[in-house]
Swiss-Prot record:
Signal peptide: none
Cellular component terms (Gene Ontology): cytoplasm
Organismal lineage: Bacteria, Pseudomonadati, Pseudomonadota, Gammaproteobacteria, Alteromonadales
GO MF terms held by the record: arginine-tRNA ligase activity; ATP binding
Oligomeric form and interacting partners: Monomer.
Family, as annotated: Belongs to the class-I aminoacyl-tRNA synthetase family.
PROSITE patterns noted in UniProt: AA_TRNA_LIGASE_I (PS00178)
Pfam families found in the cross-reference section: Arg_tRNA_synt_N, DALR_1, tRNA-synt_1d
Organism, as annotated: Shewanella sp. (strain ANA-3)
Protein name per Swiss-Prot or TrEMBL: Arginine--tRNA ligase
Xref: PANTHER family: ARGININE--TRNA LIGASE, CYTOPLASMIC (PTHR11956:SF5), ARGINYL-TRNA SYNTHETASE (PTHR11956)
Length: 581
């Protein structure tokens, strides 16, 4: 509905240009907003005030002119001017009912799909050779929710799990395996079953022994030179580490697969060419033996230009070099229209610099959008980064295990007579959903406090509340199995029916915000409001005990569309629904 009003206003502006009311080259950014007070209509715009200067008319006069020139629309019951020149639109109830009716049988719930694009999404991207920890949660689940929503809206999405599968940490691991094999022979391979312990032991040796550290660096060189033995061991480390990652993805209900892995090592063969091309364009500068690029717009507090280091003095490459190679690949090979990077906000300057350099060096097409969608940190209840009691990094599997244990206790307390298998399945869904939703419901750019107590509450904007809200709506149809709705029509008469209908009609514009800005919290907020609107409707408007069949059938259709929307919305967040709790 919002997009329909915007379209009417766009047509009006074109008419003004043809009439000479506005300059022929005038471009306006049309903003239409939902009203909070329904006495002011359903939608409003301040367009008249925005056009005042260009049209040379006062806002109220211009508002009336806009209304007089609006194309006819069955969706609009009336239009009014308010205050200094706001234009308020009242949506026709029967047109809204028809829109909702059509949405029930549509797999996209009546949403008008945008022009499809090819969109690369870079997310999760853990460093291999050790297990995933809580710091990987946000990129993984925020990215996956946006990916799901993009695909639902018809875009071609290419997932890119840009894992850290290359670098000095592998030299350290290779050196440690070499030592173990010298001591224990092939039995040393068993040590890899616990990769985290293996990594910590190797790191300890690296920090304590200069000789070991030297050997580790030598092995990195051998690995990069294609040494067969080093490459074989490297593949084993990666395979074990990726297996750990995909066990976590499966538990989280994340859609990444092995086929989506395109890590740092995939660009090794391209790095030398990146350096040559930057040099050929005269962009490279020598600084303390390293090859760097200075860009005038990036300076420190002292006003000194900040470098992008492309190649170290020892010949090694850095993240920037790999990122530039990846951007070129995503532009020239994957033909991306947009590339979204779900990476910690602390990397903002890095991405600003490499995005700018990629455009400057023409590594990417001018029409390709590069977007860093950064996120804040997950903190403990003390407000500091989330750690174990001993100050260590919290493994993601340990966090999920605790969520499952707490959810099982909660579900059992509410269902003491339920069988263990059903309890376990409900607890699995509730536990994982609680962790994911607690994160996704927060503004992506904000830090947030991780609290099991809050996220497992059945009150407020939480996963348990929404899962229960869905079962409550779906439960109506368990009591209405013999009712034929094939000929039923939605009729909006009661104020709470209209409120619910208006909320349902907003689903498409909410999803547009999710994919345009990478903000799943907007969808979470909408689903919470939708559940509240249904609750108010259900209390005020008897469904199965309605006054007549026409009213009952209409309210059942509204309930069905609510259930469909809640389920689809939760699924787009990567959250399973339950039929009972």
């Amino acid at each position: 509905m919002k997009s329909h009003i915007q379209s009417l206003l766009e047509q009006t502006i074109e008419s003004f240009k043809q009439q000479g009311i506005l300059p022929a080259d005038f471009e306006a950014r049309i903003q239409v907003d939902r009203t909070k007070d329904k006495s002011h209509g359903d939608l409003a715009t301040n367009l008249a005030m925005m056009l005042t200067k260009a049209a040379g008319k006062n806002p109220r006069e211009l508002a009336q002119l806009i209304i007089d020139n609006l194309p006819a629309s069955n969706y609009v019951a009336k239009v009014e001017i308010a205050g200094p020149g706001f234009i308020n639109f009242f949506i026709d109830d029967s047109a809204l009912a028809n829109q909702l009716q059509a949405a029930i049988s549509d797999e996209h719930l009546g949403i008008k799909l945008p022009t499809p694009q090819t969109i690369v999404v870079d997310y999760s991207s853990p460093n291999l050779a050790k297990e995933m920890h809580v710091g990987h949660l946000r990129s993984t689940i925020i990215g996956d929710s946006v990916v799901r929503t993009l695909e639902f809206l018809g875009h071609k999405v290419i997932r890119q799990n840009h894992v850290g599968d290359w670098g000095t940490q592998f030299g350290m691991l290779l050196a440690y395996m070499e030592e173990l094999r010298a001591q224990n022979g092939e039995q040393a391979q068993l040590e890899l079953s616990d990769l985290e312990t293996f990594y910590r032991a190797a790191k300890l040796r690296f920090d304590e022994s200069a000789e070991f550290a030297t050997r580790a660096r030598q092995l990195v060189v051998e690995l990069q030179s294609g040494d067969e033995y080093c490459n074989k061991l490297w593949r084993e480390f990666n395979d074990i580490s990726l297996s750990h990652c995909h066990e976590v993805y499966e538990r989280l209900g994340v859609s990444l697969t092995r086929a989506d892995v395109h890590g740092e090592s995939a660009y090794n063969a391209d790095l030398e060419q990146v350096v040559k091309d930057l040099d050929a364009q005269g962009l490279l500068t020598q600084s303390n033996g390293a090859k760097v690029v200075f860009q005038e717009e990036f300076r420190n507090k002292e006003g000194e230009a900040l470098p992008v280091i492309i190649q170290k003095a020892d010949g090694g490459y850095l993240y920037a070099t790999t990122d530039l190679a990846a951007m070129r690949y995503r532009s020239s090979v994957l033909k991306a229209d947009r590339v979204l990077y779900f990476v910690d906000l602390r990397q903002a300057l890095h991405f600003q610099q490499v995005f700018s350099l990629a455009k400057l060096a023409k590594f990417v097409r001018n029409d390709m959008s590069l977007e860093h969608l950064g996120f804040g940190t997950m903190n403990g209840e003390d407000g500091r980064p989330f750690k174990t009691r001993t100050g260590g990094v919290v493994k993601l599997v340990d966090l999920l295990d605790e969520a499952n244990t707490r959810a099982l206790e909660l579900v059992r307390s509410k269902n003491p007579d339920m069988d263990e298998a059903t309890l376990a399945e409900i607890a699995r869904v509730v536990g994982i959903s609680a962790v994911k939703y607690a994160d996704l419901s927060k503004n992506r750019t904000s830090d947030y406090i991780f609290s099991f107590e809050q996220m497992l509450s059945f009150e407020g904007n939480t996963a348990p509340y929404l899962l229960y809200a869905y079962t409550r709506v779906a439960g109506i149809f368990k009591r209405a199995t013999d009712i034929d709705l094939s000929q039923a029509k939605i009729v909006l008469e009661h104020e709470k029916e209209k409120d619910l209908g208006n909320k349902l009609a907003q689903f498409g514009e909410i999803l547009s915000r999710v994919v345009d800005k990478g903000q799943p919290h907007v969808l979470c907020g909408y689903l919470y409001e939708l559940a509240g609107a249904f609750s108010s409707f259900y209390e005020a408007c008897p469904v199965l005990a309605a006054d007549n069949d026409e009213q009952k059938h209409s309210r059942l259709l509204l309930s069905q569309l609510t259930a469909n929307t809640l389920q689809k919305g939760l699924n787009l967040l990567g959250i399973e629904t339950l039929e009972r709790m």
